[in-house]
């Protein structure tokens, strides 16, 4: 999954001033060094709690920051030395294997979307990435993830846990 920068500007707090859509990107915009983060073992461990299947009920499977089954600030810190100008952060969560078949009538209940309960970047991870960019004086080209979104489902639910499209979606807001 890759979001265009004009998509990031759906929030007024965004640090990103680039308003281009993906069709306006040049080859230089979409190539660069890769910084690889693999969280698939942690995601698989969380899925194993429910026989390898995700549940939209966070009491059954939880891909939020508190469980570690998502991208954490420590993951970003662990690759900080590799973050250079124009780098791409590429995250493997293993979630792509859930994108199969036709889903239910309510698309939010498809296992891939899982009622906004899936791994991705939360506020702490995004904040750490921006901190490293600022400290090093670099700007990454972007984030790519094998998922519905680069933001975690927890992030999408907002700080109150009930507010989709509210104050969450931290990569979109802070990007």
Q: How would you describe each model-predicted region?
A:
Residues 2-175:
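Active-/binding-site microenvironments in catalytic and ligand-binding cores
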């Amino acid at each position: 999954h890759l979001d265009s920068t004009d998509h990031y500007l759906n929030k007024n707090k965004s640090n990103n001033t680039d308003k281009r859509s993906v069709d306006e990107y040049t080859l230089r915009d979409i190539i660069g060094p890769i910084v690889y983060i693999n969280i698939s073992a942690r995601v698989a461990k969380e899925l194993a709690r429910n026989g390898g299947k995700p549940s939209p009920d966070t009491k059954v499977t939880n891909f939020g920051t508190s469980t570690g089954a998502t991208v954490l600030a420590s993951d970003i810190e662990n690759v900080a030395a590799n973050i250079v100008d124009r780098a791409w952060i590429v995250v493997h969560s293993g979630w792509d294997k859930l994108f199969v078949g036709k889903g239910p009538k309510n698309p939010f209940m498809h296992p891939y979307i899982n009622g906004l309960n899936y791994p991705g970047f939360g506020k702490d991870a995004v904040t750490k990435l921006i901190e490293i960019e600022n400290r090093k004086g670099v700007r990454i080209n972007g984030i790519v993830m094998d998922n519905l979104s680069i933001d975690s489902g927890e992030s999408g639910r907002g700080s109150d846990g009930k507010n989709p499209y509210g104050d969450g979606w931290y990569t979109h807001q802070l990007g």
